[in-house]
Amino acid sequence: EIETKTDKKSRKGNKKEAGSGRKKKKSGFKRFLIAVALILVFLAAGLYVLVGKVYAEMNYEEIESVASSPMKEEGVTNILLIGNDSRENGEDGRSDAMILLSISNKTKKIYMTSLLRDMYVEIPGHKDNRLNAAYSYGGAELLMETIEQNFDIHISRYVLVNFEAFANLVDAVGGVDLELTGKEVEYVNGYLVEYNILLGRPEGTDYFDDLSGGMVHLNGPQALAYCRNRYIGTDFGRTERQRKVLTEVIHKLPKGVLTNPKGLIDGLMPNLTTNLTQAECYRLSLMAPKILTYDIIPVSYTHLTLPTNREV
């Protein structure tokens, strides 16, 4: 067939239209990427503002001796969780619970290591004493220094909560479901007698009527009472109960953030003290969706190997 001038013009026109279509597609894809980037920037900015507002509710306490230390070392973030036993009846404010939270990006695991409060250790600048005495002598700074000196575990960040914060945290995520023995249920009721008096709550508040045990739903005060029981299984059983409750709370935390953010902020933050900076809290918030998918490993303290390959 003989191609006419009209056919040639038509073919050239089709090529131009095809090229123009590809340019439009590329241009459209670029606009899409720019839009996605802008959305991410706005979300990040919004998250930063939110973290700033939440951070303002916390109690920040800088520790100069570790301020320049990085939060993360060798892919592992170590944060010391301290439960402070400081109540209105004049107790000395020793650390009632100490759990080392080690987040390993390499193994994709969260290691929870309970440090027994009655361990006899060397306390820098003081006579040998129980580990929990270090906090009453010199606060979180001396406690971290004591742990590092005795166990060769470097810790530069901590989070301190009081009893009220712990109970509020459990309530904010909707409570926890755990298997309790009848004896453990009885102890919960016994501790609630003291708790209700301290907080001015009516006698009998949150008591269990059924003392047979089994799968039990615990609210905040009940979970706190369960964790403080050191008469069943001594301090080993006590720290195991603490890890059980904390594990359940971590599992329920993502849903709690979505369904009850105000409860978490109002109930926890004013009762929390930390040396984590706002920038570090922001980085942790960005990592949170990934971290909360990690397996949680309760570490044995009879032969302890941390993600840093150090042993205790």
Q: Across the structure, where does each feature detected by a protein language model lie?
A:
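Amphipathic, coiled-coil-like alpha-helical scaffolding segments used for oligomerization/assembly
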Residues: Y137-R201, K255, N275-C281
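N-terminal targeting leaders characterized by basic, low-complexity, disordered sequences
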Residues: E1-S20
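Extracytoplasmic/secreted envelope proteins and their assembly/folding machinery
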Residues: A97, D128, A140-E148, F163-A167, ...
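Second-shell loop/turn segments in exported
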Residues: E88-N89, N129-Y137, D152-R157, R228-G237, ...
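Flexible, polar/acidic helix-loop-strand segments at domain edges
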Residues: E91, D171-N260
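Extracytoplasmic
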Residues: E74-T77, G93-M98, T107-I110, L115, ...
